């Protein structure tokens, strides 16, 4: 959420061009430099000009959608902890949670350089290694995602 922008990020996309403002045309948006953001908000085309043009019209909504998903997840988890609901979140939006968990796993996988051999590496990490607990969160989110998908498909 911190990378995507905690507050309303749309003002960053407003153009300073009066005609563009009148026509509600967003300004050009550069691809993010942060590897996590680049993975969460990828280029749609290999052609740089086409990618920037596409990004200009889609990134604000995509970023906003990802922000909303993560904010709602945080709110529901906060309520769960504050009101001691016994580990059950009421009225869950399955799609929102799946998308949010996927974005969290993508962010963690980039930061931790997760690959197909990472679970074996994780098991060999000493308990004192700071990354071990973060890796545990990554794998736990995968387990949680899989269980949510199983529950949805069983309905």
Q: Which sequence ranges carry the predicted segments?
A:
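Charged, alpha-helix-forming regions
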Residues: 1-68, 72-87, 93-155
